[in-house]
Amino acid sequence: PWLVQMGQDRGGLYSYERLENLVGLKYHNADRIHPEWQRLTVGDVVRLVPPGWLGRRDGLALPVAQIIEGQSIVLRQQPPQFAFDAVWSFHVMPRWEDRCRLLVRSRSRMRQPGEVLGAELAGPVMALMTRGLLLGIKRRAEQAWRVNRPPA
């Protein structure tokens, strides 16, 4: 449920909200599951950047390319609507009966030397924000599990 409600205009990215808002992203990370945000289908978009941010008229929103309920969400941007082809995916892998592992993968196809340089410069920021996202989801999921687990 946490992954389905991701987005700048929904549940946030569960990362470093103050840092995101310091650069004007206007994130509000949800600390509960919102029933109104629990439906996500192929073709919907997950907004990462609000309209107008740093001159981006439409902001940045990644379309949902594939979704397998309770298992994975794949977001993909590609030409001609976007400058380059990129995929950001989330995969929930069951571990034992009461645990799971969340894998986050990203890749992009770069055609110009400047794009490669940009990706290398953005790498540390992406790593930091991905770590924040993983820790934020972990904290929320574990907290919900502690509250809702059956008595021992």
Language model regions located:
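Hydrophobic ligand-binding cavity/cleft-lining segments
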Residues: 1-44, 140, 146-152
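Acidic/polar residues at beta-strand termini and the immediately following turn/coil
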Residues: 67-68, 79
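Short coil-to-beta-strand transition motifs
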Residues: 53-61, 82-85
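Short, conserved beta-turn/loop elements at beta-strand boundaries and strand-helix junctions
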Residues: 68-73, 97
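Beta-strand/loop substructures that line and gate deep hydrophobic ligand-binding cavities in soluble
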Residues: 76-139, 148
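Short beta-strand segments that buttress and anchor functional surface loops
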Residues: 46-52, 73-80
